[in-house]
Curated annotation (Swiss-Prot):
Keywords: Aminoacyl-tRNA synthetase, ATP-binding, Cytoplasm, Ligase, Nucleotide-binding, Protein biosynthesis. Its EC number is 6.1.1.21. It holds the Pfam family tRNA-synt_His. It comes from the Bacteria. HAMAP family: His_tRNA_synth. Belongs to the class-II aminoacyl-tRNA synthetase family. It comes from Bacillus cereus (strain ATCC 10987 / NRS 248). Its main location: cytoplasm. GO terms for molecular function: ATP binding; catalytic activity, acting on a protein; histidine-tRNA ligase activity; transferase activity. NCBIfam families: hisS (TIGR00442). Homodimer. One of its GO terms (biological process) is histidyl-tRNA aminoacylation. This is Histidine--tRNA ligase 2.
Length: 423
C-alpha cells in the first residue's frame, strides 16, 4: 500500500506554487512599504509559551495544539499561531532596547492546528502576519488594519469588509467580565461543557462559542461597549476616525471578541462577502495585546497585529474569479538534433542560464517534433535549434514562438543576443 499525505495537509505542486510565490512576494512588498521587517521563528516552541501567551481557556490550547515530549522529556508544541513566538523572540532578543520603536515585524510561515479539515481550513496552513510592538498610538491600530485592507485590494478583492470592536483596557474588561458572569451564571447549566468551564476563567469566550451561539441569552448579553471607560472609549473613537481618514470602511460589531485571550482595546476581522463562498467568511483577524509582552517575561510593552490564512485568501480569489498575473513560461528551450549537438546544447543552455534566463533542454533523446511539443507545454518564448549543420556553420537557429519568425545567430554571441531580446 502506498503512503499518502496526512489528513488536513496538502501538496502544493508546480503550476500552483507560483500563485503562492506571487502572494508571498506581494506580502513582502507591502510590508516593505510600511517598514515592517521579516522575522523567522522556530516551527516548534516550548508548550508553556502558548499556555501563557495564547491562553489556557482557548480552543487552540485545549483542543488543537500538536504537542509532544522530546527525548529530553521537554514539552514542545508545533506553533499554532505566530504572535506568541514573535513576542517571545522580541523579549528574548531584547528588541525593546532598540532606539527605533515601535518594532515592526512580519512573518510568513507554517502553522499547525488539529482541526476538522474543511474547505480553506487545514491542519498545516500558512499564515502571513504582522506585529507592531512598542506603541499605544491609535494610529498604529489604524495602520495595521489599513495594511491588511490594502493588501487584499492589491490582490484584486472587492467584496471584503472590516468588522471592528473594542474590548477596552484591563479595567473595562474586568467590569464587562463581572457583568457577563452575572448574566450567564443563573442558566449556565443550559450551555455546553466548554462554556461552563469558561464562566469563571474567561466568560468573554462564551460569546465566541459556536455550539451555543443561538441561545437566547447570547442576544441579551451585556455589550462591552457599555463598559468601556472614558479612556477606552476615546481610544476606540480615535481608531475609527483614523480609518475613515484612510478611506478604510468598517462596521462596528460589539459581539466581536476573537478567539485568543491576549486581546485588549482594538479587535477586528476582515471578511469576504463574495457570492462564491455561499456565506460571509473570515479571511483574517487581529487586535491589540497590551499585556502579552509582560506575560511572556518582558517589560510592559503594548502591541498590535493581525494574521491571515493564505489558503483562505486563495479561496477568496477563486470566489471572485480573480486571475493574478503569474508567469508560467520559460525564456528559451534548446532543441538538440544528433549526438554531436547534445553536448554543445548543454553548453548553450548553461550560457543562457548564466546570462540570467530561464532555460530548459531535452534529456531524453526525443525527436525534434517531440522537443517542440515540450517547448510549447513550457510556454517557451524562444526555441534554439542546434543540429550538426548549425554546428558546422557556427550558428544557432532561433525561433520566436510568439511571431513564428526565425533567424540565424552566431554561436559565440548567442546568449547575450537572446538576453538583449528579452530585456
Amino acid at each position: 500500500m502506498s503512503i499518502q499525505i496526512p489528513r488536513g495537509t496538502q501538496d502544493i505542486l508546480p503550476g500552483t506554487v507560483e500563485l503562492w510565490q506571487y502572494i508571498e512576494g506581494q506580502a513582502r512588498e507591502i510590508c516593505r512599504r510600511y517598514n515592517y521587517k521579516e522575522i523567522r521563528t522556530p516551527i516548534f516552541e516550548h508548550t508553556e509559551l502558548f499556555l501563557r501567551g495564547v491562553g489556557d481557556t482557548t480552543d487552540i490550547v485545549q483542543k488543537e495544539m500538536y504537542s509532544f515530549q522530546d527525548r529530553g522529556e521537554r514539552s514542545l508544541t508545533l506553533r499554532p499561531e505566530g504572535t506568541a513566538p514573535v513576542v517571545r523572540s522580541y523579549v528574548e532578543n531584547k528588541m525593546f532596547g532598540d532606539a527605533t520603536q515601535p518594532t515592526k515585524l512580519y512573518y510568513i510561515g507554517q502553522m499547525f492546528r488539529y482541526e476538522r479539515p474543511q474547505a480553506g481550513r487545514y491542519r498545516q496552513f500558512v499564515q502571513f502576519g504582522i506585529e507592531a510592538i512598542g506603541s499605544n498610538d491609535p494610529a498604529i491600530d489604524a495602520e495595521v488594519i489599513a495594511l491588511a485592507v490594502e493588501f487584499y485590494r492589491g490582490m484584486g478583492l472587492k467584496n471584503i469588509k472590516v468588522v471592528l470592536n473594542s474590548l477596552g483596557d484591563a479595567a473595562s474588561r474586568q467590569a464587562h467580565r463581572d457583568a457577563l458572569i452575572a448574566h450567564f451564571e443563573p442558566r449556565i447549566g443550559e450551555f455546553c461543557s466548554d462554556c461552563q468551564s469558561r464562566l469563571e476563567k474567561n466568560p468573554l469566550r462564551i460569546l465566541d462559542c459556536k455550539k451555543d451561539r443561538n441561545h437566547e441569552l447570547m442576544g441579551t448579553a451585556p455589550s462591552i461597549t457599555e463598559y468601556l471607560n472614558e479612556d477606552s472609549a476615546v481610544y476606540y473613537e480615535k481608531v475609527q476616525e483614523l480609518l475613515t481618514m484612510m478611506d478604510v470602511p468598517f462596521e462596528k460589531d460589539p459581539n466581536l471578541v476573537r478567539g485568543l485571550d491576549y486581546y485588549q482595546h482594538t479587535v477586528f476581522e476582515i471578511m469576504s462577502e463574495a457570492e462564491g463562498f455561499g456565506a460571509i467568511t473570515t479571511l483574517s483577524g487581529g487586535g491589540r495585546y497590551n499585556g502579552l509582552v509582560q506575560e511572556i517575561g518582558g517589560p510592559e510593552m503594548p502591541g498590535i497585529g493581525f494574521a491571515m490564512s493564505i489558503e483562505r485568501l486563495i479561496m477568496a480569489l477563486k470566489a471572485e474569479n480573480i486571475e493574478l498575473p503569474i508567469e508560467h513560461s520559460i525564456d528559451c528551450y534548446v532543441v538538440a538534433l544528433g549526438e554531436k549537438a547534445k553536448d554543445h546544447a548543454a553548453k548553450v543552455a548553461f550560457d543562457l542560464r548564466k546570462a540570467g534566463l530561464s532555460v530548459e533542454k531535452d534529456y531524453l533523446d526525443r525527436k525534434m517534433k517531440a522537443q517542440f511539443k515540450s517547448a510549447d507545454r513550457l510556454k517557451a518564448k524562444f526555441v534554439a535549434v542546434l543540429g550538426e549543420d548549425e554546428l558546422d556553420k557556427g550558428i544557432i537557429n532561433l525561433k520566436d514562438m510568439a511571431t513564428g519568425e526565425q533567424e540565424e545567430v552566431a554561436l559565440d554571441v548567442f546568449a547575450s543576443y537572446v538576453a538583449e531580446k528579452l530585456i
